[in-house]
Design a protein with these regions (language model features):
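Serine-hydrolase catalytic core recognition
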Residues: 1-225
């Protein structure tokens, strides 16, 4: 169904900078009720990736959209999805900001995870295919060694794909162990990414950390979109 929220200052900022915003409801977003939940049972993120990709393909077909400049941003489960999309569909999602995400469901609390995923013992294959750490090799951003030195006066090239990851070390919902394991896997694979840590930050940044998060994210979008 069609739903929208009242305009706010953030929406206005995107509009003034020529960035189109859309919000996507995947099949388990709530509007499909029990049927939607059944679709994702024991395989979190799998069908959701397909749904987001369908939206990206539609966006890329529009004459006023630059098909190589599709970004995605999310926090918590949205952070998980952002990372998954840039690793599983970097041809459709080129830039992303993933905040406070779960990158291995074995490290999230049981009352949420097992409701949707069953236990790791009963569903090892489901945990594997839903684990962001499994798809690091699909993320294409690597280091370019022939860049010009900034002193040359030339602009540094803008990467065709870039993921930014953030997490608060005080997050008592999604423990930052998730992000530490994720960035370690990216480093082992020689991948290039942005990372911002918020000391003692909770599951959602507040005060000066919230201001920093907002401003840093805006700078990211201005650079890449």
């Amino acid at each position: 169904r069609d739903r929208w929220t009242a305009p706010n200052a953030s929406n206005q900022w995107y509009s003034e900078n020529g960035i189109i915003q859309i919000t996507v409801d995947p099949r388990a977003g709530g509007h499909n009720g029990r049927e939607g939940l059944d679709m994702i049972y024991r395989q979190l993120t799998v069908n959701e990736v397909q749904d987001f990709c369908a939206w990206a393909e539609w966006l890329q077909s529009l004459p006023y959209v630059r098909p190589e400049k599709i970004g995605v941003e999310g926090f918590s489960f949205g952070g998980t999805m952002t990372a998954m999309l840039l690793m599983k569909a970097p041809d459709k999602f080129h830039y992303g900001i993933a905040g406070g995400g779960v990158y291995d469901w074995a490290f999230y609390d049981t009352h949420y995870t097992e409701r949707y995923m069953d236990t790791p013992q009963n569903n090892p294959d489901g945990y594997k295919i839903s684990r962001a750490l499994e798809y690091v090799e699909g993320y294409p951003a690597t280091f370019i060694c022939n860049c010009l030195h900034p002193a040359s006066g030339a602009d540094m090239p803008v990467e065709p794909v870039m993921l930014k990851i953030t997490h608060g070390t005080g997050d008592d919902n999604v423990h930052h162990q998730n992000t530490l394991l994720f960035i370690d896997a990216l480093q082992k694979a020689g991948k290039k990414f942005d990372f911002m840590i918020y000391p003692d930050g909770m599951h959602g940044y507040r005060g000066y950390q919230g201001d920093h998060f907002l401003n840093a994210n805006r700078q990211f979008w201005l650079r890449y979109l």
